[in-house]
Design a protein with these regions (language model features):
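Class I S-adenosyl-L-methionine
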Residues: 1-65, 71-72, 199-201, 205-207
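Short, hydrophobic alpha-helical segments
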Residues: 111-122
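A helicase ATPase "motif cassette" and its flanking acidic/Ser/Thr-rich regulatory loops
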Residues: 103
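Acidic-aromatic/histidine active-site loop/patch
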Residues: 107
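Acidic, Ser/Thr-rich low-complexity intrinsically disordered segments
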Residues: 124-204
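Active-site-adjacent bridging/hinge elements
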Residues: 75-88
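Rossmann-like AdoMet/SAM-dependent catalytic core
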Residues: 38, 45, 67-75, 93-94, ...
Length: 208
């Protein structure tokens, strides 16, 4: 199953205002989870103790939070996948279910390789030495510890833009939430794309 596939090396896209930028609006001082054309991992809690979806700054200037249904679709599920009949007190389990779920494409690949493991490909081998950085991949079978030069992606899949998932279910942040985030980022002194805070200040507002 392992080392039977090798996709193209992933190139990290540049974070600028021409692309959707996902971030944790509940954070700001120590890190905001910048994600280009996507959202950072879903978290049930936050530094503010608020269970909430991350936010996306779109190239048109809109600052929006995806709905639960959108996050289900981002994971490859149908909208409503987390619908539950039992009422739960306090925080509902839906966000945790979506955040902890293995995405559908990954599960499909794992299942396909469990069913049909495939043959090990010919990889460049590198020695693993003590007190040296470990390689990204390797094994310890027969000849001892061996590193291999392998891609961090077993297969190459064209990922859709998060803009394709944007619909009327997305919600705007309140003035208070947006202003609070801007202030925390200013205080934290984090490295952010040029014009990011200015774009947030110019965004349409939703009073709370």
């Amino acid at each position: 199953m392992l080392f039977a596939d090798s996709g193209a090396k992933h190139t990290k896209p540049k974070a600028d205002l021409t692309r959707p930028l996902g971030f944790y609006w509940t954070e700001g001082r120590s890190g905001i989870g910048f994600t280009v054309d996507g959202i950072p991992p879903l978290k049930v809690g936050s530094a503010l103790g608020i269970p909430s979806a991350p936010t996306v700054l779109f190239p048109d200037g809109a600052v929006l939070m995806p709905s639960l249904a959108t996050c289900e679709r981002l994971q490859g599920f149908d909208a409503g996948w987390t619908d539950v009949l039992v009422k739960h007190p306090g925080r509902g389990p839906e966000w945790r279910m979506v955040g902890n779920a293995v995405s559908v494409p990954v599960a499909e690949w794992v299942a396909s390789r469990v069913k049909t493991p495939g043959d090990v490909l010919e990889f460049e081998k590198v020695p693993i030495r003590q007190n040296k950085p470990w390689p990204d991949a390797g094994w310890n079978v027969g000849e001892g510890r061996t590193g291999v030069v392998a891609s961090d992606q077993p297969i190459s899949v064209q990922r859709p833009s998060i803009s394709e998932f944007r619909d009327a279910s997305w919600a705007r942040l309140s003035d208070r939430a947006l202003d609070g985030f801007i202030e925390r980022v200013r205080e934290g002194g984090l490295s952010i794309p040029k014009g990011f805070l200015g774009a947030l200040r110019r965004a349409d507002r939703k009073a709370a």
